[in-house]
Swiss-Prot record:
Belongs to the PCNA family. This is DNA polymerase sliding clamp. HAMAP family: DNApol_clamp_arch (MF_00317). One of its GO terms (biological process) is leading strand elongation. The lineage of its organism: Archaea, Methanobacteriati, Methanobacteriota, Stenosarchaea group, Halobacteria.
Amino acid sequence: MFKAIVGASTLQDALDSVSVLVDECKIRLNDEELSIRAVDPANVGMVDLTLEAAAFESYEADGGVIGVNLARLEDIAGMANSGDLIHLELNEETRKLHIEIDGLSYTLALIDPDSIRQEPDIPDLDLASEIVVEGAQINRGITAADMVSDHIRLRVDETDEAFFIEAEGDTDDVDLRLAREDLIALTAGPADSLFSLDYLKDMNKAIPSDAEVTIELGEEFPVKLHYGFAEGLGHVTFMLAPRIQSD
């Protein structure tokens, strides 16, 4: 059983954070929250999303799991204006999701959850550095890096107490230095890892510019990026595997 009413912008933000990595996913409809966990086909990027029941205007669920085509669901949600309410109801007999937006009714065929890739385990990593920064600063660094390279280096200088976003191209280099005073918070430890810029660009599309983003970073370890939405009732964690550099 699943029946809910949610603000359009809240649903759109939730779907955006997952669709940047995968085309289809399982949605777990628990009684206290809606949750999604997915990994891209190359096993490089992961997303873990929870949206608390309190983020909805109304929410009833009993622990079921549905499979959805994210592009179709996003297209439907995109028909709504940001202030609209979206009504969602699962028909358990037909296994279809009934959606209503301001007089528009849509019935979405669901996917068998067993045919969708298994949800990943997101490891509990002990990462030495934690950087808290505005989403706009991450966007600035990624946009600059994209001008010169398809890889991006994230590192922390413990002595300088600064966070660096760097990219090195064939002829040009980019280096964004964010000192402690430019950050919301910094726990400095040994951290220096190289990542695929394409994946970070995709993740960055979902991160609001005014979001407070917590970055967990280590030495040639995956990076974790955490941020909230829906007035703190929605939570997203991205994890991205590093590119290991041979000596």
